[in-house]
């Protein structure tokens, strides 16, 4: 069931589902997303967990903050949310930007367990071939228009991009 709470003047929309006696789980979506993005995860957890699925400020049905917020302000808000509802040691599930929040909150000792889903702030291990591909294209992007002219250079880049896949 979707609910709203006011935290230090910031309204926060959230969905509370699952087993009220289960371990609390706080779901945090990625940047530019909303709570529906991770609702499929909530459904899996609901039978045994007490799930709080947040619409982070400026996303979904939660209004934007009055000032510019960074990662730490969002993390503070998640902690205030948990404190106001007497949630202790929740399991944090963070997708993308939500994963970055989970990392910050974990570093504060807020939670003893977390699950990161494609989390921002974690650099994936890459093979040398990846870097060769990326930096070759970046170099070609600057050089080909100079060598071939803008139009022919752009066509060559488009053809290369089509073969490379992105």
Q: What do these predicted ranges mean?
A:
Residues 153-166:
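Hydrophobic, aromatic-rich cap/lid helix
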Residues 10, 15-61:
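Conserved HGGG/HGGXW glycine-rich cap/lid loop of the alpha/beta-hydrolase fold
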Residues 103-143:
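Flexible "cap/lid" loop of the alpha/beta hydrolase fold
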């Amino acid at each position: 069931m979707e609910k709203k709470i006011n935290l230090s003047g910031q309204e926060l929309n959230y969905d509370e589902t699952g087993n009220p006696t289960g371990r609390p789980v706080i779901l945090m979506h990625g940047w530019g997303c909303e709570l529906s993005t991770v609702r499929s995860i909530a459904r899996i957890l609901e039978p045994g967990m007490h799930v709080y699925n947040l619409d982070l400020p400026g996303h979904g049905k939660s209004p934007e903050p009055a000032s510019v917020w960074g990662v730490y302000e969002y993390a503070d808000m998640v902690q205030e949310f948990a404190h106001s509802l007497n949630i202790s040691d929740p399991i944090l599930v963070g997708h993308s930007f939500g994963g970055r929040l989970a990392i910050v909150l974990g570093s504060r000792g807020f939670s003893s367990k977390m699950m990161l889903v494609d989390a921002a702030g974690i650099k994936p291990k890459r093979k040398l071939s990846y870097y060769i591909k990326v930096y070759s294209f970046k170099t070609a992007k600057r050089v080909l228009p100079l060598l071939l002219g803008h139009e022919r250079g752009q066509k060559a880049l488009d053809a290369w991009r089509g073969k490379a896949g992105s």
